[in-house]
């Protein structure tokens, strides 16, 4: 039995996430967690809400709530939606937890001891009207390059030119619109990533099985231009983790907090501490997952994220762990995803364009979405959600292939043999051929799942469903029954056992449907089919079952058109 630690990129606290966010991290991480649990491995699957930074403060202000209250409320909302989507976290934590405060301050102290933190004076824009320093992207003005009037202080979205806030013509606060801005000097702490460039380079080179997408992004940041730059790890904000060296104050850093991208990945570790506390466990129970001197040396650690998060997870977070000089578990495999686009454009939170997780569950159960998203995961390139493709995939794969097989075999058995597994008949050449095909395909399915090849895994699972349909079509027990009821009984018994096999293999993708199949079959035998022939005899003659309700309803053209119009844009923020 292996021990597998899985983390998913933390969803930001300011609002409900769309399906593009879901498929880029949490959903494939859940797929991998469920698969490994199904294989009998010990899994720790952690995630949390990312709660610090300017956007959280602004979202709270817009909602008219104290930021701590807003974050607590939105954490509960996101946790509930995650649960309803079947995301099987062992713990869903919060980056604002006491554990993350203590651990972030601990790491900062260790990095300072190692000489990897330096203090830098820099000039930043201060808004007198807002009473705060403004991050670059909260300053708007006219682009000096192309004249676009809503360029941000870090980049013009129109011409893509990189900018500094002082480059903008007629700059104003994006929060209040005020032009009462001034440049003030402020001091911040920087993590000396440049001093660790060679160490990080060697570490990334050792990861020979990482996706090209992941390593190419990391290498670009390491070597392009002037190479890996030092990174500011503090901010002038009220909400966040106070800057300290462990338990001690940090002179000159009073009133400042750690930058959200410094503390957020540390929450992966802190979430394990939260898990231990929530379950009445000891520090040793979570440290065996994260400290290689306390039992984590045999752990396989896998991270899931969108490609925009790769630089922080391949460079900044490893720099924090390696730089601390302590024996923390480093990531073994980093699975990154491209973007999911929406119906000819992009998902847009601000414009309400696309389907958000809460809305998705209002119109269809989670399994419909899980299947489409995972079978179309944006792995080697960006992929696109269209309503036509969604309808086609649900209707063909889920309703026609899997659902139809379950319905046909259970209803036929009920009509000819009653609601129990029939006795009689032996396997012949057709059955042996099916067993050989399934053995080959399940082996391929396992290899794809272990390699985290999400789309290929879904394709192989669908082919396994198709094999059962093709067997049923060629065996034709409804015809055989007229001449040889015994042989038909053997075919039906195999078909009913195929349903159990499908429930086991499909559980990581469509867990609710899988549970319904187990319930209909009256079994909790979820054992993995190491031996396909034995798996197809798991339900013995005389075992009672019930015919399940329709497993997946087809999506009508009218529904598709209605939803396409509804989610074209205009969601109220």
Swiss-Prot record:
Q: What is its EC number?
A: 6.1.1.10
> Which keywords annotate this record?
Aminoacyl-tRNA synthetase, ATP-binding, Cytoplasm, Ligase, Metal-binding, Nucleotide-binding, Protein biosynthesis, Zinc
Instruction: Report a single Gene Ontology molecular function.
Output: methionine-tRNA ligase activity
Residues given in the record as ATP binding sites? 349
Please state what class of enzyme this protein is.
ligase
Where in the cell? Cytoplasm
**Could you confirm whether the keyword Acyltransferase appears in this record?**
no
What Gene Ontology cellular-component terms does the record carry? aminoacyl-tRNA synthetase multienzyme complex; cytosol
Q: Which cofactor does it need?
A: Zn(2+)
Q: Its Gene Ontology biological processes?
A: methionyl-tRNA aminoacylation
Nucleus among keywords = no
Q: How is the cofactor bound?
A: Binds 1 zinc ion per subunit.
Report the main location listed first in the record: cytoplasm
Record motif 'HIGH' region, residues? 11-21
Recorded catalytic reaction(s): these are: tRNA(Met) + L-methionine + ATP = L-methionyl-tRNA(Met) + AMP + diphosphate
In which residues does the motif 'KMSKS' region occur?
346-350
Family to which this protein belongs: Belongs to the class-I aminoacyl-tRNA synthetase family. MetG type 1 subfamily.
Q: What is the purpose of this protein?
A: Is required not only for elongation of protein synthesis but also for the initiation of all mRNA translation through initiator tRNA(fMet) aminoacylation.
| Subunit structure, as described in the record | Monomer.
Designated name of the protein:
Methionine--tRNA ligase
| Biological source species | Ruegeria sp. (strain TM1040)
